[in-house]
Amino acid sequence: AKAELNTLFCSPIAWLILIIFAFQAGLTFSDLISDQLRYLALNYRPYNLTSALLLGYSGVYSSMQDNLYLYIPLLTMGLMSKEYSSGSIKLLYSSPITNIQIILGKYISMLVYALILVAILFAYFIYSACIVENFDFPFALTGILGIFLLVCAYAARGLFMSTLTAYQVVAAVGTLTVLAILNFMGNIGQDIDFVRDLTYWLSLAGRSDKFLHGMICSEDAFYFIIVVVLFLSLSVLKLKFERTTANSLSKMVQYIGVLCVTLLVGYVTSQPKLMCYYDATATKANTLTPPSQEVMTKLDGGLTLTMFVNLLDDNFNKGMPKNRNWEMRKFEDYIRFKPEMKMEYVYYYDHTDNPRLYAQFSGLSDKEIAQRLCDTYDLDFNMFLSPEDIKKVTDSKGINLEEEGNRFVYLFERENGQKAFLRIYDDNQRDPRESEITAALKTMVVKSPQVAFITGHGERDIYKGGERDYSAFAKNLTFRYSLINQGFGVSVLDLKADSMATDIADNIDFIVIADVREAYTPDVIAKIQRFIARGGNMIIACEPRRQPLMNPLVENLGITFMPGIVVEETEGY
């Protein structure tokens, strides 16, 4: 290793890479500092500076990570290639050292060089710690660890490629090619179950991003270790086969054996039940909030997440096999606390509210449209259940997808039979966030707060979508912030028609009285007062000039709506 380091630093390439690396890092960091000073001059309040300067989307660590693949092949291309081209490989073979010692010596020299690169980045760590108040040390150190592991993985790949050829340029190009293939690997065969899992694990893309986000996951840490051991083992085998006589079958068996062991270890370490996590951020930004964690601890027993994917819905592509790994990543934080959670998919076609699609295929039946879409997207039509078949499936589960508009929807099912829908929304983000996911799960472990909207006296309607009405606020399935999507149960209560009942039902937690247009009778007011007296909650909204109608409802609470309207005059209006 020492001799290799001496040789490495006798080459101008090693020094040139260090200079360019330091220059790029310094240029990036100075730009980031300038941006923060500019924000301060504009009286903006800086926040999360540890991430902004070092680990964010444009932070110095993130920027330099994106350039590493350009540097490492230039360093590794001569590790073994120069031995072949100069003939010194014969001296190595004749010396009293083993193949493992040769490869480890070469690799350790690259580890030392990697530490030098990391030391350059560590200088910005120290400077940031001096100028940033409440600097997040574990967060920043985790990012440095991720970059170091990435360099180690690149170096192992480069070393293996250099054992394959005596031409350094070919070794460098080969290393770049392998890195490109491994980065693209995650997009290969995503429609096939076994191939999807295999290529997704082999993919290098995004492996160090979690470290830059402050999360250490055992799966990613083991990935780097396994990949390093894999390519070092392949390098040792390559030297072994050059020094000994072995037939092609024997070589192939040994290479395949190393690959199989690697994949087996990778499969085991990627199992959710065996994965460990450490969130290094001070705010635990990569971890579910404590209320969400509390909900997950109460979800004892099995839990299944089923995705119902309607081919005729605009969002059907989210549930296609090629996107399953992406869908799993959405629920990764929940799988961390519920590793036995299963994910299932049900594909079907049925009529839904999709005017654009029906206008495009005017005059065709739902089945014909589904067949056209399968031909267009190269899908197997037989994987989609017919409306009759999906009806049998939903009936067996005790759910009704027609009430959901036959849209793309998630269904959580507990082992004890409890169920909860989770929806996607008609906004820019579409996917549910933690608040919506936890709200859906919470309905299965605690009683949902029940909100009753009082009707019968001209109040605002939760079934109408006008400006005056409360559809979006209360029951709109596609609006993220509607009560029904935030874990509330919503109903209407006509106290005028319900004159026979003596009291409001005990399961009601809130009543909403909005913009009454007809006076309440004494009996109705008495019901409301008894509801409040037993601990019920009331939300009341009064429009101007409705004070005489609303005051009888609140006078017993010591509240009175005053006559008139408060107006603040604005110049020019």
Map each language-model feature to its residues.
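Hydrophobic alpha-helical transmembrane segments
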Residues: 1-71, 75, 237-244
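Terminal transmembrane helical anchor/hairpin motif
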Residues: 32-55, 171-244
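Hydrophobic/aromatic residues in alpha-helical transmembrane segments
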Residues: 72-76, 124, 156-157, 235, ...
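Transmembrane helix boundary and interhelical loop/hinge segments in multi-pass membrane proteins
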Residues: 73-93, 107
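Secretory targeting signals
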Residues: 27-30, 48-65, 105-166
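Pore- or pathway-lining transmembrane helices of multi-pass membrane proteins that form conduits
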Residues: 13-23, 168-183
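Short, surface-exposed patches at the edges or C-terminal ends of soluble domains, predominantly
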Residues: 37, 191, 209-212, 218, ...
